[in-house]
Amino acid sequence: MARIAGINIPDRKHAVIAITAIYGIGATRAKAICAATGIAESTKISELDEAKIDLLRAEVDKFTVEGDLRREVSMNIKRLMDLGCYRGIRHRRSLPLRGQRTKTNARTRKGPRKPIKK
């Protein structure tokens, strides 16, 4: 297995699909990375030599991925909560942020129903 950005990339998958296993790289960015490195999208990771894998590593390192991206996202959420803005308050209360209805829906965000104590 090739190791890129601290993640073991699956060998049996095509290059475009395999590098989407890295947090922060989706389908569009994966296609752009393959185009920039000159790797065909249908090439499997196991067929790549070490030089091509090094090219992939170098191209992926240009982006914020994995731990750095997770840290950045969590710090952005924490900043909103510290500011006390509307979105921060909604994060703090574990409610939807973008104007969705909460009277009857939003069970995923709110969690299981809490029984009313009499």
Swiss-Prot record:
MF (Gene Ontology): rRNA binding; structural constituent of ribosome; tRNA binding
Q: Which GO terms describe its cellular component?
A: cytosol; small ribosomal subunit
Keywords for the protein's UniProt record, in alphabetical order = Ribonucleoprotein, Ribosomal protein, RNA-binding, rRNA-binding, tRNA-binding
Out of the domains of life, which is the source?
Bacteria
The parts of the chain that form a coiled coil are: none
Segments carrying the region annotation (Disordered) are 94-118
> InterPro entries given for it?
Rbsml_uS13_C (IPR027437), Ribosomal_uS13 (IPR001892), Ribosomal_uS13-like_H2TH (IPR010979), Ribosomal_uS13_bac-type (IPR019980), Ribosomal_uS13_CS (IPR018269)
What GO biological process terms are annotated to this protein in UniProt? translation
Keyword RNA-binding part of the UniProt annotation: yes
Report the Pfam families cross-referenced here: Ribosomal_S13
Q: Which Gene3D superfamilies match?
A: 1.10.8.50, 30s ribosomal protein s13, domain 2 (4.10.910.10)
Q: How does it assemble?
A: Part of the 30S ribosomal subunit. Forms a loose heterodimer with protein S19. Forms two bridges to the 50S subunit in the 70S ribosome.
The record's similarity note reads:
Belongs to the universal ribosomal protein uS13 family.
Kindly give the NCBIfam families that the UniProt entry links to this protein.
uS13_bact (TIGR03631)
Give the protein's function. Located at the top of the head of the 30S subunit, it contacts several helices of the 16S rRNA. In the 70S ribosome it contacts the 23S rRNA (bridge B1a) and protein L5 of the 50S subunit (bridge B1b), connecting the 2 subunits; these bridges are implicated in subunit movement. Contacts the tRNAs in the A and P-sites.
UniProt name for this protein: Small ribosomal subunit protein uS13
Task: Read off the lineage from the record.
Answer: Bacteria, Pseudomonadati, Pseudomonadota, Gammaproteobacteria, Alteromonadales
